[in-house]
């Protein structure tokens, strides 16, 4: 538990963080995969840019508790269905990760191999998104999974996580 609390404290005291996330969104009949470059800010916003696949690279935006804004060229667009009964979009998973690390309800924490696995809820309400985060040997996120009503809906491999 201490490692999760230390990470939270570092994020709250810092100017934010940066990381890349390989995201897979599972809609049951189809899985969408893409890679984002993300920057979490002190105010809680996440600025992102799509890195892969090339067909949607360059799409960027800002995500916050109030919603999001996406910018794209005329020849590119994002069209993902909603996940978790409208609670989550594949792109907003990067904001959910950052927000739950900073303020989510920690429901459990324990060792998992050489690292630590932390389970958090995004709210204190009954229908919360569950976010499982694996911390590496440096106590930084390396993987996250988001569940809705016990079903895995979004997974992220996190690379180059740095606290700013």
What does each of the following model-derived ranges do?
Residues 1-36, 40:
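N-terminal leader/targeting segments and the immediate start of mature chains
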Residues 50-52, 70-75, 145-149:
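Beta-turn initiation residues at beta-strand->coil junctions
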């Amino acid at each position: 538990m201490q490692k999760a609390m230390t990470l939270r404290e570092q994020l709250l005291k810092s100017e934010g963080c940066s990381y890349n996330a390989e995201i897979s969104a599972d809609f049951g009949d189809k899985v969408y995969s893409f890679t984002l470059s993300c920057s979490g800010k002190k105010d809680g916003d996440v600025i992102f840019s799509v890195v892969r696949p090339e067909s949607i690279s360059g799409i960027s935006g800002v995500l916050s508790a109030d919603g999001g804004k996406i910018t794209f060229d005329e020849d590119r667009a994002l069209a993902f269905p909603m996940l978790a009964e409208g609670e989550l979009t594949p792109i907003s998973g990067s904001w959910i990760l950052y927000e739950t690390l900073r303020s989510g309800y920690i429901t459990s924490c324990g060792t998992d191999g050489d690292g630590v696995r932390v389970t958090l809820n995004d709210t204190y309400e009954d229908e919360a998104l569950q976010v499982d985060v694996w911390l590496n040997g440096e106590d930084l996120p390396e993987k996250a999974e988001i569940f809705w009503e016990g079903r895995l809906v979004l997974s992220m491999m996190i690379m180059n996580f740095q606290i700013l």
